[in-house]
Swiss-Prot record:
This is Triosephosphate isomerase. It comes from Marinobacter nauticus (strain ATCC 700491 / DSM 11845 / VT8). It is found in: Cytoplasm. GO terms for molecular function: triose-phosphate isomerase activity. The gene is tpiA. The keyword Isomerase applies.
Amino acid sequence: MRRRIVAGNWKMNGSKDLVKQLVGAVREQSGSVGEDVEVVIIPPAIYLDQVAEQGGGRITTGAQNVSQWQSGAYTGEISAEMARDMGCGYVLVGHSERRQLFGETDSVAAAKVEQVLLSGLVAVLCVGETLAEREADQAEAVVAEQVRSGLSVVADGQWSRVVVAYEPVWAIGTGKTATADDAQAMHSEIRKVLDGMNAPANEISVLYGGSVKADNAAALFAEPDIDGGLIGGASLKAEEFISICRSFPAGV
């Protein structure tokens, strides 16, 4: 069975006080989440140690970004090895904000995926189309190319450490959400692309992101090819985040 994952991406938000309050609350309520659901918090790197400590072993941590280089004179960068040294289990790669604001390309994403996998961590490749691309009927082609390029470096024995997160750019932080049917359709296409790459497509978790909230998570997570969520703003509210983590259908 594929891993069920709910990952909270805090982006550039947080403080020491928030870590204590929010992570502590999530930890205390994590017992009400299904045993087959992995709860991941992805804070700014400076708070990784604190989140891990507050998580008490019940929460996995992840890094929002790592360098495409292994080490060296790259001021301000954090390597995948450093993320592992900090106890991370996951690393986001190619988030749309990295692509749009910092000019990261598919080739940069591929280089980062390679570093993450070499470090023994799980790479979460983020893919998604803009509104203009969707309206031009290019959504599937754009996402397929992002998947193929970003995961072109994955070797046969590394697919168990790959997760894909589909985040339509037009839905991130806008309050707009793809319908469950639309999200399922794209997740199914992503799985077909993975299958075409000779990856074990039915074993790879594909998450949905883009204004996921407690009131729409259940409908999304009920779809057969949606294995969880990459959560933005809602992950900064303990009750809502835990509610999302509880939104998987029972007995599946």
